[in-house]
Amino acid sequence: MEERIYLSMLLSTYGSLLTEKQVNVMRLYYDDDLSMPEIAELNNTTRQAIHDLIKRCHKMLLNYENKLKLVEKYKRNEDIKKDIKDKLYILKDKIQDKDNVQLIDEIEKDINSFSI
């Protein structure tokens, strides 16, 4: 299950580097959880052709990630954001000054709006 989620993230990140047909088949397989025979029927092709396309795209997506590391960086940034928010929550509990609590709330809001 973990690999399917990872591949779905790779597809969302690098899908624009694939052809429209490749993206369509990969989304049907990874996001919509259709079987290869079901996808083959929808695309008027063979199960083997779909299998080959999925394997080829899988390899391409992993290759893009190995070179660019965008998903890895995204996950690392999300972990850092969570860690900062956890620390702010602890700090907020310890502070009694209303102005400082408000400042912490603003910092947390800024962290939530940050994305790469």
UniProtKB/Swiss-Prot annotation:
Pfam families assigned: UPF0122
| Database matches in SUPFAM superfamilies | Sigma3 and sigma4 domains of RNA polymerase sigma factors (SSF88659)
Q: What does this protein do?
A: Might take part in the signal recognition particle (SRP) pathway. This is inferred from the conservation of its genetic proximity to ftsY/ffh. May be a regulatory protein.
Protein name (Swiss-Prot/TrEMBL): UPF0122 protein CA_C1753
Q: Which family does it belong to?
A: Belongs to the UPF0122 family.
InterPro entries the UniProt entry points to: RNA_pol_sigma_r3/r4-like, UPF0122, UPF0122_fam_protein, WH-like_DNA-bd_sf
